[in-house]
């Protein structure tokens, strides 16, 4: 941080990827200003919801829909799910695209009955605040159990040695998928993969903790700084069922 320095800050805004609550708290402690998290996609030009200034702010939430925008959480049949249950976010409003250029099939899949299907899984609370659970395509199904990688990543980020974490599904001959976690450590941190595995094991349900943890120098990222899970280097002994 250079001149004029933190004293000039009033608010920080986060978007583009789900912000771990532990990181949000660390930012607020370091800079002494609130971090307001929002949500949107290129198809929603690009904001759909926000933790609005002057309203209640809920860490870990993407807030409530912006003006003239409607959001719902639906199941696979596009029926709205009960409050607190997980489903896919769908969005309707003047900010939603008309379609993908020269991609009619993709447009028909994403836009149904005027609602844009985001591919993001979330839940909504009694106050209408939305909470991202994970990307639909990142869901891990282990022996019939649904596991949301972000839940495990949040636990890893709470460990003082962890700088970056990404949880992915690995092929398994009997279970279909097994839970794996790639981790990058903070400078100077010393901890083993087994110790990290046991740390998570003590905080989540038995079927959720990553059986495989490996430590990398850094996790791959795209141009915007998001971790790119498909580019994560996986140990050779874990890549085949």
Question: What do the predicted segments below correspond to?
Answer:
Residues 93, 98-99, 106-109, 121-208, ...:
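AMP-binding/adenylate-forming catalytic core of the ANL superfamily
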């Amino acid at each position: 941080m250079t001149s004029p320095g933190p004293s000039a800050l009033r608010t920080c805004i986060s978007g583009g990827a789900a912000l771990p609550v532990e990181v949000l708290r660390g930012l607020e402690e370091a800079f002494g200003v609130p971090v307001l998290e929002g949500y949107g996609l290129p198809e929603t030009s690009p904001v759909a919801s926000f933790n609005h200034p002057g309203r209640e702010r809920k860490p870990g939430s993407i807030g409530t829909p912006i003006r003239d925008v409607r959001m719902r959480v639906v199941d696979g049949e596009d029926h709205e799910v009960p409050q607190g249950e997980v489903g896919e976010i769908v969005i309707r409003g003047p900010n939603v695209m008309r379609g993908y250029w020269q991609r009619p099939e993709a447009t028909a899949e994403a836009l149904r009955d005027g609602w844009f299907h985001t591919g993001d899984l979330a839940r909504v609370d009694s106050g209408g605040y939305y909470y991202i659970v994970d990307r639909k395509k990142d869901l891990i199904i282990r022996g019939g159990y649904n596991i949301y990688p972000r839940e495990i990543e949040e636990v890893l980020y709470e460990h003082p040695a962890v700088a970056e974490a990404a949880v992915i599904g690995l092929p398994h001959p009997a279970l279909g998928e097994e839970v794996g976690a790639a981790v990058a450590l903070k400078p100077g941190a010393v901890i083993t993969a087994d110790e990290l595995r046991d740390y998570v094991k003590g905080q989540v349900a038995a079927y959720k903790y990553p059986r495989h943890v490996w430590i990398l120098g850094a996790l791959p990222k795209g141009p915007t700084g998001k971790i790119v899970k498909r580019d994560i280097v996986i140990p050779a002994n874990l890549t085949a069922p």
